[in-house]
From Swiss-Prot:
CDD domains: cytochrome_b_C, Cytochrome_b_N. This is Cytochrome b. The gene is MT-CYB. The chain crosses the membrane at residues 34-54, 78-99, 114-134, 179-199, 227-247, 289-309, 321-341, 348-368. Heme b b566 binds at residues 98, 197.
Amino acid sequence: MAPNLRKSHPLLKMINNSLIDLPTPSNISAWWNFGSLLGICLMTQILTGLLLAMHYTADTTLAFSSIAHTCRNVQYGWLIRNLHANGASFFFICIYLHIGRGFYYGSYLNKETWNTGILLLLTLMATAFVGYVLPWGQMSFWGATVITNLFSAIPYIGQTLVEWAWGGFSVDNPTLTRFFALHFLLPFMIAGLTLIHLTFLHESGSNNPLGILSNCDKIPFHPYFTLKDILGFTLMFLPLTALALFSPTLLGDPENFTPANPLVTPPHIKPEWYFLFAYAILRSIPNKLGGVLALAASVLVLFLSPLLHKSKQRTLTFRPLSQLLFWLLVTNLFILTWIGSQPVEHPFIIIGQLASITYFTILLVLFPTIAALENKMLNY
């Protein structure tokens, strides 16, 4: 009998082992759909971004006009732009849910997969930040100024580092040019990191909602999970297209409809919604360096998750106290997101400070403590 090409061809064999004949736990829920949704988000963003880059001019005098031209004169340019801008929001919704699922079900115990995942998150955040600067509106310009300026808080080399990043003494043409170059490069880095992420994942295989070994009950990825993923794609593209067609500016900032003006500061500088939780933590500390360290810690704290896992059970499925703590953390993140969008005045300042303390306390103190308590209650 002739060998099956899918199983013998050097390239097809890799695809087959990752997407077709991959043994998959039979009980993984819809929470396991977000990995493939992130993949489809990345592909959509690269495609729409490539089409937008063909009509974009990375120059301070022309950037804003070139985007207006894309939306008005290019065939379906408005749609491509709206899909790209709102696609970023969906990318972050998916990645936050993906991380939440990993945290809830103890997937961070696959250390390499978890760590590459955090690197992916950081790269995605960098990509979204430099991308937000490209339209060269008011919020683009001032957002870039405020956030890049934070590097000046680094002792001794800070100021030099900022001027080196800017390519001058303020955010100007060189900054825009290099940000465009970075925004083009980083998604391909994300694609490369994704392959590493998947390689590490397939070393151990997927986790499952029970957090137990599933070798005794595996099913092939295709057709079961390919079909399930296609359903996921449909359920994501529906709200994305609805948002892009009916309310494309809902998640943006009205300030960005005004071309960048270095002489006029917007009344309230704030990033896109997906950075607001970190922005709230940054603002809650009255010291510049302290704020920057807290901002970095808000994401880098995820690296500690495997070390802080004290429970004898992997998932939170059968741990009601830890579940309560998890949902408290989720609520706390919503509060931080809301605070980040508010002006710096009473009572928002104190709420932000309390929410920031709570965020780190839950992750670093309460989770390990409650896990140890649950072990004791279960006589482990």
